[in-house]
Amino acid sequence: MFKFFKNKQDNKKIERKIEFKEKLNSLEENVVFKIENLSLWYKKGEKQALKNVSANIAKNHVTALIGPSGCGKSTFLRELNRMNDTIEGVLTDGNIFFEGKNIKSKKLPVTFLRTRVGMVFQKPTPFPISIYDNIAYGPRSNGIHNKKVLDKIVENALKSAALWEEVKNNLKDLGTSLSGGQQQRLCIARAIAIEPHVLLMDEPTSALDPIATAKVEELILKLKDRYSIVIVTHSMSQAQRISDDTLFFYAGEIVEANKTKEIFLRPQLKRTRDYINGRIG
């Protein structure tokens, strides 16, 4: 009788362990970036921009990075595709895992990362070449030269960026001839033409008018079904409109991280409440 009871208890323990492991695996599968104790210094250690930052970025979510100017959010964003490597005198510590691979490892070529993590900047940056060639540039760089294949990639990318109907008859026109909002959508189309897994966006609507901003926001909400999106924004209302999760940065640290609704409706910390209510900036 005692042996039967003990075996039953052991079986329950095993079941609980299996259940816990399955939940853990499920959580890991839903994380595209895992950041552990990340610190960064400029000027060979003279100025610290990030201080022991840890966070998870969820797959197929829009994650907003908010905080006052100079708090480290853009530096953090650039670290996710190692763009800070191009700045002289930058020192880093900590780990960043992208889909399970440590991107801080010298064994991982930066080209692996750049083909999987696209970037859209604050100011639209179309190349001074045709609309078609703007989109085809990335695929060509990756070895695709068949015209029929390129035509399809260009069309699909422009459709995904909600720009195809506006430019399909003018693909030979310069990308720089488009309006500001169209240029930004062209840059988004260019980023997704290489079929990345993640889109990083550094204040992508700050230079746009309200109508163009609304179109880009609508596009972001559609794109998250296919991509994980991380966006830096100074607009509290924009973060609430388009993001699922929010990381609040202050003085190089993540002060609070949570679902966006929780951050804005039920912030846990006074500093978060003060920032959201405009008492600090």
UniProtKB/Swiss-Prot annotation:
Places the protein is found: Cell membrane
Bilayer topology: Peripheral membrane protein
Residues noted as binding ATP in the record, renumbered to the chain: G67, P68, S69, G70, C71, G72, K73, S74
Catalysed conversion reaction: phosphate(out) + ATP + H2O = ADP + 2 phosphate(in) + H(+)
Enzyme class at the top of the EC tree: translocase
Protein keywords: ATP-binding, Cell membrane, Membrane, Nucleotide-binding, Phosphate transport, Translocase, Transport
Coarse class of the protein's main subcellular location: membrane
GO molecular function: ATP binding; ATP hydrolysis activity; ATPase-coupled phosphate ion transmembrane transporter activity
Superkingdom to which the source organism belongs: Bacteria
GO term, biological process aspect, one: phosphate ion transmembrane transport
Entries under SMART domains matching the protein: AAA (SM00382)
Record has Transferase as a keyword: no
CC per GO annotation: plasma membrane
Enzyme Commission code: 7.3.2.1
Pfam families reported in the protein's UniProt record: ABC_tran (PF00005)
Stretches assigned to the ABC transporter domain: 33-276
Record-stated family: Belongs to the ABC transporter superfamily. Phosphate importer (TC 3.A.1.7) family.
Function description: Part of the ABC transporter complex PstSACB involved in phosphate import. Responsible for energy coupling to the transport system.
Complex formation: The complex is composed of two ATP-binding proteins (PstB), two transmembrane proteins (PstC and PstA) and a solute-binding protein (PstS).
Protein name listed in UniProt: Phosphate import ATP-binding protein PstB
Gene (name only): pstB
